[in-house]
Amino acid sequence: MYDVVIIGGGPAGLSAALGAKKKGCGNILIIERSEKLGGILNQCIHNGFGLHTFKEELTGPEYAFRYIEMVQKENIPFLLNTTVLSVSPHSVTYINQEEGVRVIETKSIVLAMGCRERPRGALNIPGDRGAGIFSAGTAQYLTNIQGKMPGKRVVILGSGDIGLIMARRMTLEGAKVLAVVELMPYSSGLKRNIVQCLDDFSIPLLLSHTVTKIIGKKRVEGIEVSKVDEKKKPIPGTEIFFDADTLLLSVGLLPENELSRKAGITISPVTGGPVVDNSFQTNREGIFACGNVLHVHDLVDYVSSEAEKAGENAALYALYDRKEEKKVIPISVFGLARYTVPEMIHEDTKEDTTIRFRVSNVKKDGKIVVRINGEEVISKKKRIMAPGEMETIIISKRILDKYDSIESMEVGTED
């Protein structure tokens, strides 16, 4: 029997394994469905990773390699080319070419499956279905891993971070990026990516616009873009035609939670990921979740720190049989805060607790407020908050020590 089985060998899975090892777990297994560890980082050859974790700027493969080296140094075993079919609180069923279908027993499980891109089918874009329509991640894989150019004249729908980064990558590879088109009146990517990927390369960003028609039977021959009103409906007469041969879609990421749903884990309708407490445990005892399977992060450094905590808690659960009934208090949100992760906190929490959330709209000169038992304990001024940037607030042990028990907690924004 394993102490901890980790599903996913990307940055979250690797960090969770190291966290479990740090707490004294000797019997750990990482299961990865692709042919190598590292997850999505292997195709992210741009820099900007590791500034928080390693205090230096790394590319995605360099960041992944450091964690793979640490995992190998700790002699943590892993399975590659292995697909998990189902999980339950104390067993994992997987399949691979060497062993066929196998069921293994484990004391705890960490879900670290990451996320996937929203496909074209979810967007209902009218027009033809010619070649030349890619998700931004697929275009990234073709360009960075396979060395193939998806197209020469490109329009990008959606201003998520992958779309912004691919606007720069396509330009550097010799393509002409005609425009990045965003439905919302604000970008959904990080401010630094807008500056480094669009402004520095003079790529136009069309806010409150969307693609209203794709032209081209065999291959994309043109893209029609229209301005939208407050209800996100295209405004007749505002059409712009782009002579493009490629459309890249960067229209959001979806946490990969088919296994979680099959296991009976409660999924948040806001994040699309499991509902967890401040130990990252789900409603199914012994099953923990971390990384982009939980909610989509801005920075891999945040994924690593969160996953390490999840791994540590999974190890403590496995080693010390931590199954006592603990009362958990839901964290409620107010103002522009859409959700929090974690969504619940143990009433007797006495350690620094990190709360992450996103706002529903751009807010300037506001503040983040935390209330415990109705009393305001944190008020942090923010010059600007935007949906594309995740907000982080740390509730210190010093604050939590003042309360014998937590009856209510609220996190939100105020003017």
Task: Please place each PLM-identified region on the residue numbering.
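Predominantly flavin-linked oxidoreductase catalytic cores and closely associated redox partners
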Residues: 101-102, 111-205, 212-219, 286, ...
